[in-house]
């Protein structure tokens, strides 16, 4: 994830990280999507499907941590991931999919080309760093 947030601390593969990864993979609400090119993980994202009591009790999806390794950008891998995440959300009967991005104009246009609409809602964040 260094290509997403270069200031993030390095994660060491240890027992607690392996346990967390195992829990994440077993959680049916979380869908981890990856692109592998010749054994190299070049792009990934996560779709979380949340149960909901509105909209006829239909769930909604949140896409997070969309990242492509800098050496593999502009080759369609990110688009492939986003489209797959949207397809899964539809299969899960989500009434909407949301994502947030604080990146530059190119990134915002990337999401718009994938079908997302800018300016429909306003996002708010509280960080606990």
Locate each region found by the language model.
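Residue-level recognition of the GNAT/N-acetyltransferase active site
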Residues: 69, 102
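Conserved hydrophobic beta-strand within the GNAT/NAT acetyltransferase core sheet
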Residues: 63, 97-101
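A conserved beta-turn-beta hairpin within the catalytic core of GNAT-like acetyltransferases
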Residues: 51-63, 73, 120
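Conserved active-site alpha-helix within GNAT-family acetyltransferase domains
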Residues: 79, 91, 95, 103-121, ...
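Conserved acetyl-CoA-binding loop-helix of GNAT-fold acetyltransferases
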Residues: 64-68, 74-87, 113
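A short helix-loop-beta-strand connector motif used in the catalytic cores of GNAT acetyltransferases and
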Residues: 22-34, 62
